[in-house]
Swiss-Prot record:
Name of the protein in question: Tyrosine recombinase XerD
SUPFAM superfamilies per the UniProt record, alphabetical: DNA breaking-rejoining enzymes (SSF56349), lambda integrase-like, N-terminal domain (SSF47823)
Localization, UniProt: Cytoplasm
Family, similarity comment: Belongs to the 'phage' integrase family. XerD subfamily.
GO molecular function, one term: DNA binding
Entry GO terms, CC: cytoplasm
Length: 297
């Protein structure tokens, strides 16, 4: 990883220590500050540059085709950075105070219909140990709305089949208990009884859904497995994302009248506004049904 200016490294260390940001967020900030540092003409020009200089930097990014969402993130990063510089007495003024974040276009998450989800869940062959594992994973994803990273990092100790719950360590190391339902419980038990020992052979693993090498599966590997089963189920790849079953979980709950705050708790969202996007998905679906079936639609 590229070594940055010691002041920038100090800033990133402070973020890690004081704000408990995720590894991916910290990495994004580091990459943004690498780009920013490369753009500066002189080393440590960030100690003297002005609001106008920052506008030129952001304008240069837009000219190169960066999206507004990317600009919004780097503005957020720069605001934190220059606030840090002021707090640590590296600067007296904050040139980001006048910056305006671009309006971020709301991206509706891609979701599947209930019929498509059933087709996807039915795609794995439960007679094959690997596909039985995948079947249990897909069922658990749809039953709980877990993030893929949360799913693949589950250990046996996180699961309580008798009580029908799974203990999840989410973003910011926040813990939540999520009910898993009868169908997912059944397939997890099937995997324990018939697939797991065959998959592991003589190896030992605490991972709930291990790879053939008894290790934790990677996000990329699981994403490839989802796409494989989607093809078998005849689902358009354009409708897919690694979190497709998480989105379906939330959308289908809201479609069936679930309280938004309950969905928020199940998903592990810290902010209700993050969950509210699924109400837009549900409304879009309702409008589509109305247009298709209402005589004056």
């Amino acid at each position: 990883m590229k070594k940055l200016d010691p002041i920038i490294e100090q800033f990133l260390d402070t973020l890690w220590l004081e704000q408990s940001l995720s590894h991916n967020t910290l990495l994004s900030y580091r990459l943004d500050l690498e780009l920013f540092s490369a753009w500066l003409v002189e080393p440590r020009a960030f100690l003297t540059l002005t609001h106008t200089d920052l506008q030129l930097f952001l304008g240069d990014r837009l000219d190169k085709g960066y999206k507004s969402s990317s600009s919004a993130r780097i503005i957020s990063c720069l605001r934190k950075f220059f606030r840090f510089l002021c707090l640590e007495k590296y600067r007296l003024d904050d040139p980001t105070s006048m910056l305006i974040s671009p309006r971020k276009r709301v991206q509706l998450p891609k979701s599947l219909s209930e019929e498509q989800v059933m087709d996807l869940l039915d795609a794995p062959n439960p007679l094959d140990p690997i596909e039985l594992r995948d079947k249990a994973m897909l069922e658990l994803l749809y039953a709980t709305g877990l993030r893929v990273t949360e799913l693949i990092s589950l250990t046996i100790d996180n699961l309580n089949l008798r009580q029908g719950v799974v203990r999840v360590i989410g973003k910011g190391d926040k813990e939540r208990l999520v009910p898993i339902g009868e169908e997912a419980s059944y397939w997890i038990q099937e995997f324990f009884d018939y697939g797991r020992m065959i998959l592991l052979s003589d190896q030992q693993s605490d991972v709930l859904f291990p790879s053939r090498r008894a290790k934790q599966m990677t996000r990329q590997t699981f994403w490839h497995r989802i796409k494989y089963y989607a093809i078998l189920a005849g689902i358009d790849a354009e409708k897919l994302s690694p979190h497709v079953l998480r989105h379906a979980f939330a959308t289908h709950l809201i479609n069936h009248g679930a309280d938004l705050r309950v969905v928020q708790m199940l998903l592990g969202h810290s902010d209700l506004s993050t969950t509210q996007i699924y109400t837009h998905v549900a409304k879009t679906r309702l409008k589509s049904i109305h247009k298709q079936f209402h005589p004056r639609g």
